[in-house]
């Protein structure tokens, strides 16, 4: 085991502060509409130009092991906020730095940091309550477009495309962001449930021009295992032929005489059919088949149920208005499942998303959720250069997350105004003792920092702007604030300067959590740098007489 270095008390906190400041100072310059760009140099490839706080934070790794602990903890604030809310990473970083700075100041004066932390937690709880009171539901398309525009660093083109996507697939629908092969940014919407499996034989094609197999009002057989023996398949085929409707077979694989029988009957016009492989692998395949069964009102014939293929009846098959199968995709449109069962399945997947700790699992669960909820929207981001494309793609991804957060929990006035208004409620909040009161005062001061930083990045005096915003709140209403893009004081809702409540809430909660943890730390432990062993080269060899 490598030797460790340990530092304590003031020395430990000073190192944490140095690390926090190095990261936060690089990130906070990007805050607001007039935030500056940060250029990230790479060992290979072109440098990346970005205004995205979490992208900047992720690049930072400090040489000093103790300072790096502080930097990594604040990086965690940015990453966690991005994961939960999709935006607000820079705000969270600014808040964490401000809370930690103020906390260090009171700790140096001899306050009990454990009581100070209790005061901080109490104040954050109150701030969150106030944010909920300030929050306004997002229902109108115009508001969705405004949120998306702001989250994409005031790019109205991206705002409009995201609003279109949300309108098409709804709040639970999946919006994926891909790189376009052209300079244009476009939107493509796939209605219904689509999975990445195409027909098993080109002989199933019904539209030679588009190379698609289109089945109108088909039955859908959902089977977990391989189908090779035609005898197993024959009973259900005969029932489907009598019904006069087409058949889609979804199975692990369809091969041999079973596939040949389907193809021959399809070509002769006896039974319009198509066979595709089931999506996914292992347990994930079972989940997908279960989703398809719920969506189409059928039954997934799995080994667990003990049902043999030859004993399957028509009422076990799923049904849909239409199925379109091409070489690579299968799309089920208008599944005829029970809406209540679909709703229950959606709720079950939502719970799994909340409980999972794996990013990969979360992504796959969200894909399943979207497919059940009614569609997938693909935003293809285009730009003139590779560097611009990467930066724009980051912004679009952020904006999609933030817009979903706004639809989920509502919106508050942007530009740091919501936190300033919420902080006014702390005037009446009393701690159990003097040190807790110091913690409450820390939050009261810290939550006003984002507004000051936005003003400063735009070239204005943050303290002067803050005073004016507090004054306007009393005179004209809580939604009045400072538009850093124009330098004017406006009604933030009317000017379209808004933040998703979830973003602001997550930012303050995560920032206070990490800053409080750092304040109460009394020791830091890090690996000692390894001493490099001197290589013995031929020149180092002793000379022989």
From Swiss-Prot:
GO CC term, one of those recorded: GroEL-GroES complex
Broad enzyme group: isomerase
Broad class of where this protein is predominantly found: cytoplasm
Keyword set includes Nucleotide-binding: yes
Sorted UniProt keywords: ATP-binding, Chaperone, Cytoplasm, Isomerase, Nucleotide-binding
Disulfide bond positions: none
Catalytic activity: ATP + H2O + a folded polypeptide = ADP + phosphate + an unfolded polypeptide
Family annotation (InterPro entries): Chaperonin_Cpn60_CS, Cpn60/GroEL, Cpn60/GroEL/TCP-1, GroEL-like_apical_dom_sf, GROEL-like_equatorial_sf, TCP-1-like_intermed_sf
Localization annotation: Cytoplasm
SUPFAM superfamilies per the UniProt record, alphabetical: GroEL apical domain-like, GroEL equatorial domain-like
First and last residue of the signal peptide: none
Residue positions binding ATP: 30-33, 51, 87-91, 415, 483-485, 499
Gene3D superfamilies, per database record: GroEL, GroEL-like equatorial domain, TCP-1-like chaperonin intermediate domain
EC number: 5.6.1.7
Example GO biological process: protein refolding
Keyword ATP-binding included in the entry's annotation: yes
GO molecular function annotation: ATP binding; ATP-dependent protein folding chaperone; isomerase activity; unfolded protein binding
CDD domains in the cross-refs: GroEL (cd03344)
Function field: Together with its co-chaperonin GroES, plays an essential role in assisting protein folding. The GroEL-GroES system forms a nano-cage that allows encapsulation of the non-native substrate proteins and provides a physical environment optimized to promote and accelerate protein folding.
Family indicated by similarity: Belongs to the chaperonin (HSP60) family.
Quaternary organization: Forms a cylinder of 14 subunits composed of two heptameric rings stacked back-to-back. Interacts with the co-chaperonin GroES.
UniProt name for this protein: Chaperonin GroEL
Lineage of the species this protein comes from: Bacteria, Pseudomonadati, Aquificota, Aquificia, Aquificales
């Amino acid at each position: 085991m490598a030797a460790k270095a340990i530092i304590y008390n003031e020395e430990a906190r000073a190192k944490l502060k140095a690390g926090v400041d190095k990261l936060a100072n690089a990130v906070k310059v990007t805050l607001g509409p007039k935030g500056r760009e940060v250029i990230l140099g790479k060992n290979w490839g072109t440098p990346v130009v970005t205004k995205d706080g979490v992208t900047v934070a992720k690049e930072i790794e400090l040489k000093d092991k103790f300072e790096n602990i502080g930097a990594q903890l604040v990086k965690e604030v940015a990453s966690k906020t991005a994961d939960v809310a999709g935006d607000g990473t820079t705000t969270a970083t600014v808040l964490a730095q401000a809370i930690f700075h103020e906390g260090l100041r009171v700790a140096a004066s001899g306050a009990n940091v454990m009581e100070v932390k209790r005061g901080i937690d109490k104040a954050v709880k109150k701030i969150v309550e106030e944010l909920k009171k300030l929050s306004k539901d997002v229902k109108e398309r115009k508001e969705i477009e405004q949120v998306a525009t702001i989250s994409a660093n005031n790019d109205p083109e991206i705002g409009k495309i995201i609003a279109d996507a949300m309108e098409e697939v709804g709040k639970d629908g999946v919006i994926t962001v891909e790189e376009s092969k052209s300079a244009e940014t476009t939107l493509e919407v796939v209605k219904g449930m689509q999975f990445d499996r195409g027909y098993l034989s080109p002989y199933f094609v019904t539209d030679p021009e588009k190379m698609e197999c289109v089945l109108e009002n088909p039955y859908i057989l959902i089977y977990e295992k391989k189908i090779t023996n035609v005898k197993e398949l024959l009973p259900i085929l005969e029932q489907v032929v009598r019904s006069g409707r087409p058949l889609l077979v979804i199975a692990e694989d369809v091969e041999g005489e079973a596939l040949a029988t389907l193809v021959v009957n399809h070509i002769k016009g006896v039974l319009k059919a198509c066979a595709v492989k089931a999506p996914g692998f292992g347990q994930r395949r079972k989940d997908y088949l279960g989703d398809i069964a719920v969506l189409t009102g059928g039954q997934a014939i799995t080994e667990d149920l003990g049902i043999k293929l030859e004993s399957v009846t028509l009422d076990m098959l799923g049904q849909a208005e239409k199925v379109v199968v091409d070489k690579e995709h299968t799309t089920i449109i208008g599944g005829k499942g029970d809406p209540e069962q679909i709703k229950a399945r959606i709720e079950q997947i939502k719970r799994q998303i909340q409980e999972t700790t794996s990013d990969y699992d979360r992504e796959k669960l969200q894909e399943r959720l979207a497919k059940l909820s009614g569609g997938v929207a693909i935003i293809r981001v285009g730009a003139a250069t590779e560097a611009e494309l990467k930066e724009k793609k980051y912004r679009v991804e952020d904006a999609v997350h933030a817009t979903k957060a706004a639809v989920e929990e509502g919106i508050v006035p942007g530009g740091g105004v919501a936190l300033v208004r919420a902080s006014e409620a702390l005037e009446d909040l009393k701690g159990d003792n003097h040190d807790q009161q110091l913690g409450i005062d820390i939050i009261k001061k810290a939550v006003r920092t984002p507004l000051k930083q936005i003003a400063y990045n735009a070239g204005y005096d943050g303290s002067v702007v803050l005073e004016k915003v507090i004054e306007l709140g009393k005179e004209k209403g809580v939604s009045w604030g400072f538009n850093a893009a124009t330098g004017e004081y406006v009604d933030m809702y009317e000017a379209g300067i808004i933040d998703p409540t979830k973003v602001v809430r997550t930012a303050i909660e995560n920032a206070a959590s990490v800053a409080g943890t750092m304040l109460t730390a009394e020791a830091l432990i890090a690996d000692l740098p390894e001493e490099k062993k001197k290589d013995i080269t031929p020149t180092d060899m002793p000379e022989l007489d």
